[in-house]
């Protein structure tokens, strides 16, 4: 079989700060083909370890560009002066600017830190000076960790913080500091010159004193994690493992309207017959930031009142883990607006949800492992105004003294749940994902070709969801994907602005892991689904302008593809029927 001219996925994913790398293989070697990816916000994914994580998990932007305005410094910074730990000439020199006794630093100023534990880290190397400190004002007081980078030794550390230093070779060390934030506020975080006694960040040094720095990182949790370089942090593709294998996650724009999504002890949540112990257990993120909710008496209820600005379908989700109560105890989740709009129950014994009252549109539970479940229901909100969304035991009780664990509440407009969006004091929006590649006429067959993709849709609904090969204006185009009916594929073959083929075909469950291929050449077009040829035609019209772009939509004209894409392949030849059947067989 021919080799694809452009591939994505098939277990081989490479992500850059603002793009996704496709590839071509020649003699078992991979040659990158850079895709254009945009979202303009961060997002979350399920990583290879099965944990929910922020993408990117490095909370520092411009992690290797210390002259960027995101950083505030009193040092003299000379860029790209020495080889960094990754072998590139990208490490900077930080030099004392004055002999005056003072503090000299590279920091993030007024950097918002939510409640929880955080670890900052830098790669550092002695140039002419070898004493530095990591400093933060996490939790409202000065947290200082001193390091001797002449010999690789941790000095004194503020009580309540932990520090480490790791030799990474060639004189470089990775230094880290972990501190606990209990209130959530704007903080100072960064790296300072320290005195040689390692007991002060007020120093009087020579104008020639300097050290090298590279690779700043701030992450949630108590471990520094593998270094992840960043620029603006906004357009990083998400390779998701929620289905057990890797896939590119493409989602529509959604907003989490639930405030303090991980902090049920906050006043945004009203507690009845309940006490909350914050950050008491490891959450689905792998960080100790989930809460324990204990029934203290009366009726157990945790709720938040949210003002709804438009009527329609809303989806509520929350992560839940059983505590010490009898496993037969059911949990109740619902919405109230002048009366019960509807509620569901969740049974830990069977990992199932059930509708008890109201017009619940859909409901389900998903196991994340380690006893955690994500519970979801979709309900129609018939009027604007305040709606109370609640969690609690059926009958109002799980038993006084009994407890459960909770994390990650989310309310979003839409008929199905999307990936988790953390919030603090305000709602947060995750923008839609887009992925395109232009200027690739040489990679697309102009007189014949094949387009293949393997993907799993996010919802089985009546909405077009397409991928396309096209020219710049879309007058010549091949589109394939989900039709605007719940069970059909859509195939379009357009030449010189005329729709020569424009059909809903076949039968498909959009949320299944489907393999789809379309092949084309003069006198033959065909579509294959999961190992079966489901459509053929014999048109002989040639494209009037070159197809020069690929997009996960209708050539930029709407109908974006949202789902979990496991593979994409573009060929400059029309594969045989047997090859297409083999390619699409599950």
PLM feature segments, named:
Residues 1-5, 203, 218-246, 412-443, ...:
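Extended recognition patches within non-cytosolic domains
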Residues 56-63, 70-75, 100-102, 112-116, ...:
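Extracellular glycan-recognition modules
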Residues 66-67, 124, 208-224, 264, ...:
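Extracellular, beta-strand-rich glycan-interacting domains
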Residues 81-103, 280-301:
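Short carbohydrate-recognition loop motifs
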Residues 103-109, 143-147, 155-168, 300-306, ...:
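Short, aromatic/His-centered strand-loop micro-motif at the edge of beta-sheets
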Residues 126, 178-183, 322-324, 378-383, ...:
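Localized edge beta-strand/strand-to-loop motifs within extracellular or lumenal beta-rich domains
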Residues 173-177, 185-190, 373-377, 453, ...:
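Carbohydrate-binding surfaces in secreted/extracellular proteins
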Residues 188-211, 386-403, 537-564:
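Flexible glycan-contacting loops in extracellular carbohydrate-active proteins
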């Amino acid at each position: 079989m021919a080799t694809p001219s452009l591939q994505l996925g098939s277990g081989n994913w490479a992500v850059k700060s603002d793009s996704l790398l496709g590839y071509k293989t020649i003699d078992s070697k991979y040659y990158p083909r850079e895709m254009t990816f945009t979202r303009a916000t961060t997002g979350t994914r399920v990583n290879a370890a099965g944990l929910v994580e922020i993408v990117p998990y490095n909370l520092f932007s411009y992690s290797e560009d210390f002259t960027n305005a995101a950083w505030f410094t009193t040092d003299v910074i000379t860029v790209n002066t020495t080889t960094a730990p990754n072998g590139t000439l990208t490490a900077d020199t930080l030099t004392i600017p004055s002999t005056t006794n003072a503090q000299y630093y590279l920091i993030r100023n007024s950097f918002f830190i939510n409640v929880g534990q955080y670890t900052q880290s830098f790669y550092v190397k002695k140039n002419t000076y070898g004493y530095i400190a990591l400093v933060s004002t996490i939790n409202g007081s000065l947290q200082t960790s001193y390091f001797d980078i002449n010999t690789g030794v941790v000095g004194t550390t503020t009580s309540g913080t932990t520090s480490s230093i790791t030799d990474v070779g060639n004189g470089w060390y990775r230094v880290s500091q972990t501190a606990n934030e209990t209130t959530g506020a704007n903080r100072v975080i960064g790296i300072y010159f320290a005195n040689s006694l390692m007991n002060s960040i007020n120093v009087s040094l020579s104008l020639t004193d300097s050290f090298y720095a590279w690779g700043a990182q701030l992450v949630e949790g108590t471990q520094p994690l593998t270094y992840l370089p960043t620029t603006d942090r906004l357009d990083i593709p998400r390779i998701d493992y929620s289905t057990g294998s890797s896939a590119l996650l493409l989602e529509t724009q959604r907003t989490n309207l639930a405030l303090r999504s991980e902090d049920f002890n906050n006043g945004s949540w009203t507690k009845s017959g309940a006490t909350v112990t914050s950050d008491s257990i490891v959450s689905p993120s792998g960080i100790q930031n989930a809460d324990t909710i204990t029934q203290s008496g009366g009726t157990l209820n945790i709720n938040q009142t949210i003002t709804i600005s438009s009527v329609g379908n809303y989806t509520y989700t929350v992560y839940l883990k059983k505590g010490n109560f009898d496993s037969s105890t059911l949990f109740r989740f619902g919405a109230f607006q002048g009366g019960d709009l509807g509620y569901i129950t969740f049974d830990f014994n069977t990992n199932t949800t059930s509708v008890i009252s109201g017009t619940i549109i859909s409901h389900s539970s998903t196991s994340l492992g380690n006893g955690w479940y994500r519970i979801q229901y979709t309900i129609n909100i018939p009027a604007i105004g305040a709606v109370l969304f609640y969690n609690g035991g059926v009958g109002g009780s799980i038993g006084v003294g009994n407890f459960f664990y909770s994390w990650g509440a989310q309310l979003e407009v839409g008929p199905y749940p999307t990936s988790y969006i953390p919030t603090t004091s305000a709602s947060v929006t995750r923008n839609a994902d887009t992925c395109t590649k232009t200027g690739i006429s040489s990679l697309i067959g102009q007189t014949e070709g094949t387009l293949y993709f393997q993907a799993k849709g996010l919802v089985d609904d009546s909405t077009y969801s397409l991928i396309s090969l096209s020219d710049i204006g879309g007058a010549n185009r091949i589109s394939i994907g989900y039709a605007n009916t719940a069970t059909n594929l859509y195939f379009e073959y357009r030449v010189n602005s005329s729709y020569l083929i424009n059909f809903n075909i076949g039968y498909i469950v959009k949320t299944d892991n489907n393999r789809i291929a379309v092949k084309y050449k003069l006198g033959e077009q065909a579509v294959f689904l999961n190992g079966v040829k489901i459509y053929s035609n014999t048109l002989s019209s040639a494209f009037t302008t070159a197809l020069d772009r690929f997009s996960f939509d209708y050539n930029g004209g709407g109908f974006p593809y949202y789902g979990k894409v496991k593979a994409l392949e573009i060929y400059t030849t029309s594969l045989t029927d047997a090859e297409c059947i083999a390619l699409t067989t599950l």
